[in-house]
């Protein structure tokens, strides 16, 4: 896969970590960049700046040490508020502003934000025009294929986006009504790619190197947005890049390497969030890392009762040292891709 340009920035391998609320915090973004992501995007930040003083919102902002280019996703349904939020994030260090018109969550859509905006093409245009005019950095957009299967207007929205000055577009291959059920469809993404000249990134159900190649071939997309498949498997980016370059799959990770990555991730979470919140946040990540391993269910029940950072790290070490064998119960197990 060739490099993709977004304004002055180059995504060297066309692979982007999709923004995911509650997941793509700074520790996870840094880890995914280290393990092959060409660009990482922050968690969604509300455009309502009156809410930015909460600890939750502050932690979602750009921080020292964030890998460049620093991309921040904003969400909202008011053009002026979105423009103001974009400008404020640039002042805080954002180098790319990403607009969320793809989130299907009810709490977002009920506020006429996220993928709810796809119902109102004029409002889509107003928001995009306002944000692009407000900042001097590239503005990107994430959408779904439409509101529901009878209203797949992703192609129209993509044309609106290009005319408004959006510099790259990510398309999830489901409608808002689909949520995350069923399978993503890629025909609409292919149509969008043919209709616009800005870079298009395909998203949805890309969970293996082989699937990545299939989606690229099916859509003609310039790159890929990887989301849920990176949870507990941040090395998926280098797996995909290697496969696309060579046609060969990388060997599965040894358990010792998974242990190292997981402990590094836990330590970063504990530092970033502090002991109390860091312990809570770490629980879901550990569940994702170990989901396919024998004994993981019992271990998670124990791990989720731990209340301090040292105990969490010690128990992870013990889990791996007690002969964690992997899917085939082999010594020095390999983690299945």
UniProtKB/Swiss-Prot annotation:
<dbReference type="InterPro" id="IPR004652">
    <property type="entry name" value="DusB-like"/>
</dbReference>
<dbReference type="GO" id="GO:0010181">
    <property type="term" value="F:FMN binding"/>
</dbReference>
<keyword id="KW-0288">FMN</keyword>
<keyword id="KW-0521">NADP</keyword>
<feature type="binding site">
    <location>
        <begin position="203"/>
        <end position="205"/>
    </location>
    <ligand>
        <name>FMN</name>
    </ligand>
</feature>
<keyword id="KW-0694">RNA-binding</keyword>
<feature type="binding site">
    <location>
        <begin position="227"/>
        <end position="228"/>
    </location>
    <ligand>
        <name>FMN</name>
    </ligand>
</feature>
<keyword id="KW-0819">tRNA processing</keyword>
<dbReference type="Pfam" id="PF01207">
    <property type="entry name" value="Dus"/>
</dbReference>
<dbReference type="GO" id="GO:0000049">
    <property type="term" value="F:tRNA binding"/>
</dbReference>
<dbReference type="InterPro" id="IPR024036">
    <property type="entry name" value="tRNA-dHydroUridine_Synthase_C"/>
</dbReference>
<dbReference type="GO" id="GO:0017150">
    <property type="term" value="F:tRNA dihydrouridine synthase activity"/>
</dbReference>
<dbReference type="InterPro" id="IPR018517">
    <property type="entry name" value="tRNA_hU_synthase_CS"/>
</dbReference>
<keyword id="KW-0820">tRNA-binding</keyword>
<comment type="function">
    <text>Catalyzes the synthesis of 5,6-dihydrouridine (D), a modified base found in the D-loop of most tRNAs, via the reduction of the C5-C6 double bond in target uridines.</text>
</comment>
<feature type="binding site">
    <location>
        <begin position="19"/>
        <end position="21"/>
    </location>
    <ligand>
        <name>FMN</name>
    </ligand>
</feature>
<keyword id="KW-0560">Oxidoreductase</keyword>
<dbReference type="InterPro" id="IPR035587">
    <property type="entry name" value="DUS-like_FMN-bd"/>
</dbReference>
<dbReference type="InterPro" id="IPR001269">
    <property type="entry name" value="DUS_fam"/>
</dbReference>
<comment type="similarity">
    <text>Belongs to the Dus family. DusB subfamily.</text>
</comment>
<keyword id="KW-0285">Flavoprotein</keyword>
<dbReference type="GO" id="GO:0050660">
    <property type="term" value="F:flavin adenine dinucleotide binding"/>
</dbReference>
<dbReference type="InterPro" id="IPR013785">
    <property type="entry name" value="Aldolase_TIM"/>
</dbReference>
<dbReference type="InterPro" id="IPR032887">
    <property type="entry name" value="DusB"/>
</dbReference>
<feature type="binding site">
    <location>
        <position position="73"/>
    </location>
    <ligand>
        <name>FMN</name>
    </ligand>
</feature>
<feature type="binding site">
    <location>
        <position position="142"/>
    </location>
    <ligand>
        <name>FMN</name>
    </ligand>
</feature>
<feature type="active site" description="Proton donor">
    <location>
        <position position="103"/>
    </location>
</feature>
<protein>
    <recommendedName>
        <fullName>tRNA-dihydrouridine synthase B</fullName>
        <ecNumber>1.3.1.-</ecNumber>
    </recommendedName>
</protein>
